[in-house]
C-alpha cells in the first residue's frame, strides 16, 4: 500500500492444485494463516522482497506479490498489479488484519490512482 507492505499470509489448499476453485470457492476450504508463521527475520525479509518487487517493476497503488518458501528461501512467483477485492480475496483480508477497513482500503486505492506521477 504505497511504500508499505501490509503483511504476509500463508495459504494451505486442501485440493491437489491451487486453482480457480481453491481460490474463489468458500467450499474449497483453503486455509489462510495470518500472519504467515515465519520467524521475525524471515517475515521482515518477505515484506522487504515484496516492496522491492513493487519498486523495481515501477508499480503504483496496491500490488500483491506471491512467493514460494522452499529450503529457507523465498522465490517470487508473480507480482499482481490488480489483486482481487472480493470477500475471499487476500488483499482485503490482510488489510483487515492490519486494522484497515475495506471502505478505507478502497478509498486509499481511488485517491492514490488519482495522483499524477
Task: Write out the residue ranges for each language-model feature.
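Cysteine/selenocysteine-centered motifs that mediate thiol-based redox chemistry or coordinate metal-sulfur cofactors
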Residues: 105-117
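Internal helix-turn-beta structural module
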Residues: 84-92, 96-108
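Catalytic core of tubulin tyrosine ligase-like
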Residues: 4, 9-14, 20-23, 27
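Conserved metal-phosphate-binding beta-hairpin within the catalytic cores
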Residues: 1, 55-85, 95
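A long amphipathic alpha-helix within ATP-dependent nucleotide-binding catalytic cores
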Residues: 26-71, 112
Amino acid at each position: 500500500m504505497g511504500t508499505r507492505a501490509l503483511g504476509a499470509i500463508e495459504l494451505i489448499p486442501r485440493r491437489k492444485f491451487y486453482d480457480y476453485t481453491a481460490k474463489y470457492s468458500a467450499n474449497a476450504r483453503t486455509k489462510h494463516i495470518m500472519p504467515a508463521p515465519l520467524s521475525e527475520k524471515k517475515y521482515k525479509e518477505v515484506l522487504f522482497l515484496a516492496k522491492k518487487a513493487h519498486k523495481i517493476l515501477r508499480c503504483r497503488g496496491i500490488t500483491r506479490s506471491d512467493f514460494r518458501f522452499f529450503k529457507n528461501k523465498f522465490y517470487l512467483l508473480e507480482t499482481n498489479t490488480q489483486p482481487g477485492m472480493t470477500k475471499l480475496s487476500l488483499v482485503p483480508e490482510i488489510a483487515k488484519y492490519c486494522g484497515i477497513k475495506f471502505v478505507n482500503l478502497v478509498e486509499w486505492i481511488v485517491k492514490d490512482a488519482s495522483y499524477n506521477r
